[in-house]
Amino acid sequence: MAGRLQDEVERVIVGQRQVLREILTCVLAGGHCLLRGVPGLAKTLLIKTVAQAVDLKFSRIQFTPDLMPSDILGTEVIEEDQTTGRREIRFIPGPIFANIILADEINRTPPKTQSALLEAMQEFQVTIGGVRHALERPLFVLATENPIEQEGTHPLPEAQLDRFMLNVLIDYPSAEDERRILEATTAGVEPEVRKVATGADLENARALVRDLPAAANVIDYALRLARATRPADPAAPAFVRKSVKWGAGPRAGQALLLTAKASALLDGRTVPSLDDVRAVAAPVLRHRVLLTFQAEADGITPDQVVTELLRGN
């Protein structure tokens, strides 16, 4: 199923094979994914194409500065029965009531509205007027964001970032891929995306990923990596204690292990290895490592911290 999905998306998306693999890894692991990159790199198109290839309900939310939480979650309205004159409150679901949610340019809206997704992403429900409304399963939030240095952007709260299993960076295509993009997008025919997977397929794949066995050394390695990002941990190396303000929480270890299993499954293997954990370490940890002000001033990035951790482990 994952192979068919990848092949179908690549009929539309040129290049970005590693980015697509990381997104599929996240989907198979049952998590939410955040794509970060400058405008014009097909982040939105990539997510829309993945959604079109799956037979699930799709919803797009365009995050803007004036977006309100009710625009995402839904709202309650008072309706009057024309016959009896009786009034009652009716809940109108928002776009979050879908299976695949494209949260486009999520950091264009203030943190208050961004935080409206917290309960939905973690507990698969929303609370409106004190009433809980269950969301549809499966639920995948695939969000895009522009670099925070750009005008009109707001940093995502740490609690919001931690809800995303992976933070995937998308970069400029190679010269060869960009030439293929020019040829494909200036022609008269656009490829039609076929549905090659169902919601049941994704749920079965997710269950299979969780059922895959992991050796004790793989579990210990994922645990060690996550704990090594915390400056207060006795096992943290000196550069972490110097450069990191806050490290990754327990969700990071869970994400490392689940995405390592999903990565192994994508390669046709049923047992994850240490290399699988290393392969997903950067997208799992980069948004969970908060640097000190001095480290940022020195030009250090979370990816550099993760790279150093992998060298020492």
Regions found by a protein language model. Give the residues of each.
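Walker B catalytic acidic pair
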Residues: 37, 104-105, 116
